[in-house]
Amino acid sequence: MSTLFTNNIASQNGTSIAVQSGHAITGAAGSIVVPKQMIQYEHNFANNTGFSTTSSSMVDVTNFYVDITPKYTNSLLIFECTLDSKTTTAAAYARYRLVDSNNSDTVMHTNTYIGQSNYWAGTSEWLTTSLRTVFVSGTTSTMRLQLQMQLNSGGTFEMNWSGSDQRVLQVTEIAV
């Protein structure tokens, strides 16, 4: 067996390189990276119950986190989740953000928030909220991507829809 050391491989003729039938290019996990392809997927299950707050400053949403150890510092991470909630005051509304709780609650997105819910909704209306954000990982250390929220305009924010409802929080790492 021989070893070929090179920084670039180019086709002598045309724009593609053929691999003979029955042969394959192999490598250790992560050694072959195709831009815009998924590198890894991580998730966490959380019950949509047992969380309420009156806080007008950011607090952790209990069990709404997902852990990931990015393979590359420049890859994109896509975070997604849904939740059901209501407020006890019609004018109240929630704002959400995503932080890395393993890194001093560093905010992971470029704007202040990643979404809102319950704005001028009735006090007995349970609303489903979808949250999604994309950001550059910036590290290969383990991250705990924690959802946080704050309640504006008073009242109480509740996530007590059903103890039998399970939510998926997920993060996908994408090569650039």
Residue ranges and their predicted role:
Residues F64-V66:
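Extended, low-complexity regulatory regions
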Residues F45-D60, T69-V176:
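Terminal beta-strand-rich extracellular "head" domains
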Residues T3-F51:
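Glycine-rich, low-complexity segments
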